[in-house]
UniProtKB/Swiss-Prot annotation:
The last Arg residue of the ACP-binding site is essential for the weak association between ACP/AcpP and FabH. It holds the Pfam family ACP_syn_III. SUPFAM superfamilies: Thiolase-like. Keywords: Acyltransferase, Cytoplasm, Fatty acid biosynthesis, Fatty acid metabolism, Lipid biosynthesis, Lipid metabolism, Multifunctional enzyme, Transferase. Its EC number is 2.3.1.180. Pathway: Lipid metabolism; fatty acid biosynthesis. It comes from Coxiella burnetii (strain RSA 331 / Henzerling II). It catalyses: malonyl-[ACP] + acetyl-CoA + H(+) = 3-oxobutanoyl-[ACP] + CO2 + CoA. This is Beta-ketoacyl-[acyl-carrier-protein] synthase III. The lineage of its organism: Bacteria, Pseudomonadati, Pseudomonadota, Gammaproteobacteria, Legionellales. Residues 247-251 are annotated as: ACP-binding.
């Protein structure tokens, strides 16, 4: 049997840091309130730097390729999960292909599942390796949500940061991705939105979110999907070594960990330092944990994410 196995990870975050103390000067909020309600102390932001969605994706990809120890010429697919592409077209994936000077006889495309984008991209890549003969796939999660937040809205501007994370998936006989599950429900599409300026030229494409409703649904749906993927995989909760959640809200993360019976020290947390980096949050956290020596080859990881759409998903894998 052929598995899709993570061979390398990489990430990138902008240099500029926006702290809660900085936000106290911008909106009516406090460090104590943000930490209690969300769990974010600081976030990295593009601001006026040369960084953008494409450059961050490229830098994360280079680090993943380096760790994987592969020649970039062997990459036979690029999938980018992002909701904040630099262009409507071309895709971010094609721009990554250009900057990495990858060969042209490969597919390269973006998917937009908002904060669940990386898990969606990982699931698609897994299917191409299992069923279509792909050997090396570059999967990237990247977002620049600070470019679309309303900096006068204290309920949302405190949440987000910018960044990118990437993995190289390689066809392998040893177990890698065991299962993925993806769900969506467009009936809740109005709960998290950022409208395109194409149709309403006078509007500003600010992010809007009904936080209380999203929080309740996230706790419920993530709880259900982690149960579903564990049952589908035939594992017990005790077989999970690490939970790598989407870093949206510490209270949501704690609810999922409690449901799994996992202590906090078995949950990879970067939310305090990064904030919610949308599609980048899971690969950012994975990269940080691998490079810190926490997660090791052979560990069983549960990844889960929930975002606008509403779209949510989970992946269970052996590193």
């Amino acid at each position: 049997m052929t598995y899709a196995r993570i061979q390398g990870v990489g990430s990138y975050i902008p240099q500029q840091i926006l702290s809660n103390a900085d936000l106290e000067k911008m909106v009516n909020t406090t460090d104590e309130w943000i930490m209690q309600r969300v769990g974010v102390r600081e976030r990295h932001v593009i601001a006026n730097s040369p960084d953008n969605t494409t450059t961050m994706a490229v830098d994360a990809a280079k680090r993943a390729i380096e760790m994987a120890g592969i020649d970039p010429a062997v990459i036979d697919m690029i999938i980018v999960g992002t909701a904040t592409a630099e262009y409507y077209f071309p895709s971010t994936a094609c721009l990554v292909q250009k900057h990495l000077n990858l060969r042209e006889d490969i597919p390269a495309f973006d998917i937009n599942a908002a904060c669940a984008g990386f898990v969606y991209a990982l699931s698609i890549a897994d299917q191409y390796i299992r069923n279509e003969g792909a050997k090396h796939i570059l999967v990237i999660g990247v977002d620049s949500l600070t470019k679309v937040v309303d900096w006068k809205d204290r309920s949302t501007c405190i949440l987000f940061g910018d960044g990118a994370g990437a993995v190289i998936l390689q066809a392998h006989k040893e177990p890698g991705i065991l299962n993925t599950i993806l769900h969506a429900n467009g009936d809740y599409s109005d709960l998290i939105t950022a409208k395109s300026g194409v149709w309403e030229r006078e509007s500003v494409p600010h992010l809007h979110m009904y936080g209380k409703e999203v929080f309740k649904l996230a706790v419920t749906k993530l709880g259900e999907i982690v149960d579903e993927i564990i049952e589908k995989s035939g594992l017990k909760q005790s077989g999970i070594d690490w939970l790598i959640p989407h870093q949206a809200n510490l209270r949501i993360i704690e609810a999922t960990a409690k449901r799994l019976g996992l202590p906090r020290e078995r949950v990879i947390l970067t939310i305090e330092q990064h904030g919610n980096t949308s599609a980048a949050s899971i690969p950012l956290a994975l990269d940080a944990a691998v490079r810190a020596g926490k997660i090791k080859r052979g560990d069983t990881l549960l990844l889960e994410a929930f975002g606008a759409g509403l779209a949510w998903g989970a992946a269970l894998l052996k590193l």
